[in-house]
Regions:
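Active-site cores that bind ATP or allylic diphosphates and position pyrophosphate for catalysis
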Residues: 66, 71-187
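N-terminal Rossmann-like or analogous alpha/beta NTP/dinucleotide-binding catalytic cores
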Residues: 1-92, 168
Length: 187
């Protein structure tokens, strides 16, 4: 198995944590085949520190945008707070979807202008789920779980953040990319 350090931003970095993790694994005689080590890294699928994989994540965000599967969202913290308040008042699920996803269909020129003006933005997934339909008409996804069997759930209809305004990926986005390229089969 491999040891990956899943810290994508400096706020969550704890000095000495990698050494502690490696030492605890050594103490319990749990060896790993590759990954982050006290004296560097070893293995074919590195770097094993997510904070060193920014270029990989940027590449995939660009691909998603080019394919129309992601978009820059220019909502400010104040606007996001207003949206949350309105959704709570209307007893709606909180999040950016449907009419709340106001940056979703901006033209290339509008996006370019906002970026030129220096407006901060995040990159959001452009979900394909329906938003304004009764629950029984919502799309569903079924997965075959090795232990529980078939599990059916509603398709995602939220335009979740993939890349923060700082250029740092969200945990979930980084995890999917890394699991794919590191050929992760079991967690």
């Amino acid at each position: 198995f491999f040891l990956r350090i899943e810290v994508t931003d400096d706020k969550r970095y704890v000095e000495g944590a990698v050494e502690t993790i490696v030492n605890v694994l050594d103490y319990f005689e749990i060896g790993f085949d590759e990954g982050a080590a006290v004296d560097g890294e070893r293995g074919d699928y590195g770097p094993y520190h997510q904070s060193q994989r920014a270029e990989v994540y940027q590449t995939f965000v660009k691909r998603l945008i080019q394919r129309g599967l992601a978009y820059p969202c220019f909502l400010t913290e104040e606007e996001l707070s207003d949206i949350r308040s309105k959704q709570e008042a209307e007893k709606l699920n909180p999040g950016i979807y449907g009419k709340w996803a106001v940056s979703r269909d901006l033209s290339y020129e509008e996006i370019e202008e906002k970026i030129r003006e220096g407006k901060p933005y995040v990159i959001r997934l452009k979900s394909s789920g329906k938003t304004d339909v009764p629950a029984e008409e919502m799309d569903t996804i079924t997965v075959d779980d090795a232990i529980r069997g078939p599990i059916t759930m509603p398709a995602n209809n939220m335009d979740v953040v993939l890349l923060k305004a700082t250029g740092i990926p969200t945990y979930h986005f980084a995890h999917v990319i890394d699991d794919h390229f590191m050929r992760t089969t079991h967690v």
